[in-house]
Amino acid sequence: MLICHQCLSSRLTYISNLGLNIAYRLIEQFTDDSKLVIVVTSRTLPRVREVVDLIKTYAEKCGKSGAVDFDYLLVDFTDMVSVLGAAYELEKRYDAIHYFYANAAQGVYSGIDWLGATKAVLRDPLDAVTNPTYKIQRVGVKSRDGLGLVFQANVFGPYYLIRRIIPLLAKGKAKVVWLSSLMSDVKYLSLEDVELLRTDSSYEGSKRLVDLLHLATYKELKSLGIHQYVTHPGIFTSHSFYQYLNFFTYYGMLFLFYLARWLGSPWHNIQGYKGANAPIYVATLANPTFEHQALKYGSATYRDGMEYIAKHEIDPTGMHDAYKYIRDLAEEWDIKLKDQITIGRSLS
């Protein structure tokens, strides 16, 4: 167990841009006599404060305010110096981490192809709201580090942080949970464009990389006592596209989601709370002796909204090449950040 600055026996949960519903369900599931410390991360302090206030209110509602404590960490996964700084802060503050959620979901969207969306809905409404290929994504967007922005935010940044804090995760016998997507098909990733700079499906490609990265690393982590899983939340309403919807299109989307569920789609969870089912299941309920880590665990619902866990096989095509690229890139950044490491140590 972790001894934190409050001198209480604690379990530390590191939340990487984690959706509130996952935090809520984690609080509900936590029944240990020890204290749960939730580390909220964001790029900005106002967002951290907002999230902490919401989680505190929920903990009080559940009657667990005394069992939950909070810390925060400012980190930008599209800035490698920031990622390195986050690793050092965690090393300074804590002895162990018990849960790590890698939930980055950066996209470079610029709108919706309404003509394409209309045609898709008329042609096959169920497929249109399950595989929405009419979202417009910008091509070639780089971070200030010169890397593909979506690749760095969703894949490389979180991977690099995990890699730097392996000792903390090992001490806590941690559960590392990656959030992938229902739309992480093989077709969205070209091994000639691992940084996703030449594709108009960079978000989906990044989630395909998450699947492959998990397959390539979970066995090595398991040998260190760290159990890693990959999950997806199904389909639910989120704030990411509200700016492109008006009153009519929002409720039209909601109607189609419920219609899809009624027609038999297991993936239209609709509420974010239900979408959080699989990420919580693998962290708190799954038995690592029996659960297969090579599978993807998805949040699913029956027609009546009853929740269940659905398991997927993951196509390993390209796993070794993708992992080699990411691993080699991490080693390059070790060298680039060498001076930052020296500076960080001299100031600590």
Curated annotation (Swiss-Prot):
GO terms for molecular function: 3-beta-hydroxysteroid 3-dehydrogenase (NADP+) activity. SUPFAM superfamilies: NAD(P)-binding Rossmann-fold domains. Its EC number is 1.1.1.270. One of its GO terms (biological process) is ergosterol biosynthetic process. It comes from the Eukaryota. The active site is at residues 180, 203, 207. It is an enzyme of class 1 (oxidoreductase). Pathway: Steroid biosynthesis; zymosterol biosynthesis; zymosterol from lanosterol: step 5/6. GO terms for cellular component: endoplasmic reticulum membrane; lipid droplet. This is 3-keto-steroid reductase. It comes from Eremothecium gossypii (strain ATCC 10895 / CBS 109.51 / FGSC 9923 / NRRL Y-1056). The gene is ERG27.
